[in-house]
Amino acid sequence: MFSSSVELELFFIFVLVVLNGIFSGSEIAIVSARKVRLEQLAKRGNRKAKLALKLATAPNNFLSAVQIGITLIGILTGAVGGATVALRLAEFLDDIPLLAPYAGPLSISLLVGFITYLSLVVGELVPKRIALSHPEHIACGVAPAMHLVAQLTAPLVYLLGVSTDAVLRLFGITSKEASPITEEEIRVMIEQGAQAGMIDEAEQEMVERVFRLGDRPVKTLMTPRTAIAWLDVESDWEENQQEILDTPYSRFPVGRDSLDECLGFVRVKDILNSQWSGQKINLEEIVQPPLFVAENTRSLHVLEMFRASGTHLALITDEYGGIEGLVTLNDLIEAIVGSIPNDDEIQEPQIIQREDGSYLLDGLLPIDEFKEIFDIETLSNEEEGHYHTLGGFVIESLGKIPQSGDYFVSDTLRVEVVDMDGIRIDKVLVNQLPEDSSTTEEESETDN
């Protein structure tokens, strides 16, 4: 029915569609390939991976070359257009009485529909699906050919680039460099990796904590001054010895009458060495130089200071030079991996979820962890640095040192003080209220 010229024309159209598919698949593969994976392959000596990485790191020229190829293929496909095929198909339809009056338009419509279908399936969808399923492997496979195409079309790409920039300038648009990847984007990628099962939940939590550690001031991790176990050079050795025996620590700050007169810190190891050698214990002789850190120093920076100094303990100072607290290397590690209790330490959890869904929280709970529990973005006066713990948030919200039973409402949370340790907030009960709750902060203050 059809002559050899028709078959040749159909074959030529099919070849053009396949070439279009190669360009489309190559574009998707190189753009979506993970650069980290390509770098790993390139370091192992994979030359194709080096070419793919080169194309991926400078995508503008490569994408322009691909677009030139796809455009030329589209023009050639339209030029060939299957004119001979349409003519032969019209002659075939003329033999059918019912279709004879519409043979010409119908043959063109059928041919256009066939070429469109073939172009979409073979020239676009299938190659892109394949490229997305194995981007790095395919990117390495097509890199040599695409690199050659980019070199051959370089003059035309340059001309098109200059022309495009000129047109954009007419509209007052200037090209900008791609913004670097943000921390939030990394968080999303990690979350997606965890959902896909590629990253363990524990690994995800640790990475999230590392990000938080970079933002948290060291004050949020410190042991407050009132809870510091320290040794006084003016006290009898028996008193200092009992302080060491009563606590599980291996390092102690040393002061003279007060922590504000801090001389440094001593290691229990050095005390034992002096004692076992028969020497009289003199804390001033074995004291190590102290490391002082401002209260608003970022925790991650303190970790770097520990690494540089070889010290595992730092004293936190306020703006007046007074000792406000103490932080150790163990505190920073626990902020990343979670609580690590000592063998002889019975540690009460800071977060307890009760059967009714409410939470019993420690007053010293870092405010970042409180926000994470209830998925809160920001709290009142938090950015001003007025508080860093749940207890500080309660005092800020109530405007006074509370008593047991005092409470307030913040958004949909009812926050109640249930236990005080002197003037320190020990335990706080937090309930999630319904969103349509009519309870207001003003009503709670009236009740109090």
UniProtKB/Swiss-Prot annotation:
InterPro entries per the UniProt record, alphabetical: CBS_dom (IPR000644), CBS_dom_sf (IPR046342), CNNM (IPR002550), FAD-bd_PCMH-like_sf (IPR036318), FAD-bd_PCMH_sub2 (IPR016169), Ion_transp-like_CBS (IPR044751), Transptr-assoc_dom (IPR005170), UPF0053_domain (IPR051676)
Entry's localization field: Cell membrane
Residues covered by the CBS domain: 222-281, 286-345
Transmembrane portions of the chain: 11-31, 62-82, 106-126, 142-162
PROSITE patterns found in the cross-reference section: CBS, CNNM
One GO MF term attached to the UniProt entry: flavin adenine dinucleotide binding
Membrane topology: Multi-pass membrane protein
All residue ranges annotated as the CNNM transmembrane domain in the record: 2-203
Keyword terms, alphabetized: CBS domain, Cell membrane, Membrane, Repeat, Transmembrane, Transmembrane helix
SMART domains found in the cross-reference section: CorC_HlyC (SM01091)
GO cellular component, one term: plasma membrane
Pfam name, any one: CBS
Family statement: Belongs to the UPF0053 family.
Annotated protein name in UniProt: UPF0053 protein sll0260
Organism: Synechocystis sp. (strain ATCC 27184 / PCC 6803 / Kazusa)
